[in-house]
């Protein structure tokens, strides 16, 4: 067991600046948790990557600060994270030289955004605009100003906006504060502003739309009701017409029935003499057996024909 634990102990015993990626990859979650518990941490993380980060940060805190990575880790963990503001101002502090000869010294800024020997400072300075840069590059001096001008502190303002860097010289602190306040509240405009804000315009448009929508809904509802009433009236009229036509058809059928009966009787009466002639011819052809028939049977035969014709009608 000691053989398996000794490599982790030797890795964790190394100073932070001597640790390599291979050493960190050999660490396990249990080794990191044990190291953190031994150092006094109550609840170390169960995640391996987080536990390794906790070990590195703890070692950075315990080790003395220097210019190596351990010192950087210590500075980051001990000091609170400071987010760079969108608008930064650098003010000039009065020095002993200002009291003596009226000169103002600017501190050196090694950043990429700082511009040395800016021609704009000549416009804002009010003096001759002549600059002298020393050999060491630590200080730049400007021409002396009057006591009224030097009483108010004037500095340089750098603005980072939409990926661009703008540097302005000769900005007083009050003006810088007002610009920062305006940048912090971009939506709040003055009361006597020329243009209305986009939110107010959108609110007015939305209110107008909300007023128009109920009116359109009421118009649609009224039109649907009117169409429904018209449809019901049309249905009633069509039903009434249908009933009237039906009654007319019934009356026409009732009127046609007597005419049909009279015509059938006329046809029967017209056909009766023909039937008698045909019957007499049949009697002449057949001979005695038919002559022997009684007159009652002869009288019954036309009746039979009448009954058949009546059934056919």
From Swiss-Prot:
Subcellular location: Nucleus
The keyword Nucleus belongs to this UniProt entry's keyword annotation: yes
Gene Ontology terms: biological process: leaf development; regulation of cell population proliferation
Region of interest called Disordered, as start-end residue ranges on this chain: 118-149, 220-256, 281-313
UniProt feature coiled coil, ranges: none
Biased composition (Basic residues): 243-256
SMART domains, alphabetized: TIFY
InterPro entries linked to this entry: CCT_CS (IPR018467), TIFY/JAZ (IPR040390), Tify_dom (IPR010399)
Motif (Nuclear localization signal): 234-241
Gene inactivation effect: Plants lacking both TIFY4A and TIFY4B have larger leaves and cotyledon laminae, a dome-shaped leaf curvature and shortened siliques.
Oligomer status and interactors: Interacts with AFPH2/NINJA.
Function recorded in the entry: Regulates the arrest of dispersed meristematic cells during lamina development.
Family statement: Belongs to the TIFY/JAZ family.
UniProt-recorded name of the protein: Protein TIFY 4A
Source species of the chain: Arabidopsis thaliana (Mouse-ear cress)
Organismal lineage: Eukaryota, Viridiplantae, Streptophyta, Embryophyta, Tracheophyta
């Amino acid at each position: 067991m000691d053989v398996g634990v000794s490599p982790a102990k030797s890795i964790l015993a190394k100073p932070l600046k001597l640790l390599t990626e291979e050493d960190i990859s050999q660490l396990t979650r249990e080794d990191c948790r044990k190291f953190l518990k031994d150092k006094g941490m109550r609840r170390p993380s169960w995640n391996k990557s987080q536990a390794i980060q906790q070990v590195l940060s703890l070692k950075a805190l315990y080790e003395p600060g220097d210019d190596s990575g351990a010192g950087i880790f210590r500075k980051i963990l001990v000091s609170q994270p400071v987010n760079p503001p969108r608008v930064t101002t650098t003010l000039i502090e009065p020095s002993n030289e200002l009291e003596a000869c009226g000169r103002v010294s600017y501190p050196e800024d090694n950043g990429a955004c700082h511009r040395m020997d800016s021609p704009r400072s000549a416009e804002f300075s009010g003096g001759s605009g002549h600059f002298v840069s020393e050999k060491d590059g630590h200080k730049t001096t400007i021409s002396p100003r009057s006591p009224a001008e030097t009483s108010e502190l004037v500095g340089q303002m750098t603005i980072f906006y939409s990926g661009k860097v703008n540097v302005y010289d000769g900005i007083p602190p009050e003006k810088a504060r007002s610009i920062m306040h305006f940048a912090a509240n971009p939506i709040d405009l003055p009361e006597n502003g020329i243009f209305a804000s986009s939110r107010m315009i959108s609110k007015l448009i939305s209110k107008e739309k909300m007023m128009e929508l109920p009116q359109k809904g009421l118009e649609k509802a009224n039109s649907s009701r009117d169409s429904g009433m018209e449809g019901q009236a049309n249905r009633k009229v069509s039903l009434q017409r249908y009933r009237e036509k039906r009654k007319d058809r019934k009356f026409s059928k009732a009127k046609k029935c007597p005419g049909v009966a009279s015509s059938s009787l006329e046809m029967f009466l017209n056909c009766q003499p023909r039937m008698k002639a045909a019957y007499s011819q049949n009697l002449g052809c057949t001979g005695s057996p038919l002559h022997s028939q009684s007159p009652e049977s002869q009288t019954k035969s036309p009746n039979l024909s009448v009954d058949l014709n009546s059934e056919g009608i």
